[in-house]
Amino acid sequence: MKHKHRKTVDHVDRGDVRQGYQPTLTPANAPLRELSVGRIRLDRKGVAKYAGETGGNEVLLHILVGQCTIQASGRWGRQTFKQLGERVDVFSGLPTSLVLGPRTTYTITPVTRTVDIAVASLPVGRAGRSIPTAIRPQDVQVHTIGEGHYVRTVREVLGGEGPAVRLRAGETLNPTGLWSSWPHHDFDANVKLAPQFEEVFLYFTKPRGGWGLQRRHGLYSSLQQVDDVIVVKNGDAAILPLGEHPVVAGVDSQVLYIWFYMSPIPKTYSKWAEDLGGYA
């Protein structure tokens, strides 16, 4: 279905900080066809609970900060995941996530006073795996990849062998002044894949007033072309095209970005793929 005369965005400055669920970049407000990314913020002194359902999507609840209990139910039964999350900030340790399949209802209740969760979803129809799967810090694969001025740390949450069918996710940590998402992915030059590739980065900086630069050159899934460089700050989000999208941390900053993407093939770099699988 084509949307005519619809204003869309491909970069959000700090997003919406209201409590509850707030969409960040979705097909409703951005040049995306399938991938949706948002945030759930809860506070026991404000919005103290969130109830949702996945519909025909697989959903990743990626806990950024705080701890919560999540109860999920579906045709397979009911399961409660207690005390998910360990971090006081995204730089302080490895993440905890929960993958939910289609036709699942869920309720999130904070354990700590506040909890902040990134939410990514993709339609899967009947192909989705129904039983929820927790991805705890010990399940996250950590790689150091690149060399020279583009060495970075990658925390692989949902790789090709993970419990999700279509969704891939992880975190990349750029040390001060260094680059990541480079060199090119193996398939970046294959423009025929553009309609099947969508990716969103959610950025965090240390210190909170820090910054980075995001280069974007290529095609969105809508075949819209992009060629720009944007300043990214703590809490920003951006759509990445099929093509070039390297990131550099500012000279006084560390940058951590969370990546969510859908792709028809694994996202690898040929130079070190044999050793590390190579992600962002």
Predicted feature locations:
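Acidic/histidine-enriched, beta-strand-rich ligand/metal-binding domains
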Residues: L193, F204-T205, G209-A280
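Double-stranded beta-helix
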Residues: D89, R113-E156, R215, I258-A280
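Conserved hydrophobic/aromatic beta-strand scaffold that supports enzyme active sites
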Residues: V37-R41, L60, S97-V99, V119, ...
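Conserved metal-binding segment of the jelly-roll/cupin
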Residues: F91-V111, L122, V231-D252
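A short glycine-rich, His/Asp/Glu-containing loop-to-beta-strand
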Residues: G15-Y50, G148-V200
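Short, structured patches in soluble enzyme cores that scaffold and shape functional sites
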Residues: P102, P110-T112, V119-P123, L158-G159, ...
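Glycine- and acidic-residue-biased ligand/ion/polar-headgroup-sensing regions
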Residues: G55-Q83, L100, T176-G177, D188-N234
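Extended, compositionally biased flexible segments
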Residues: N29, R33-P110
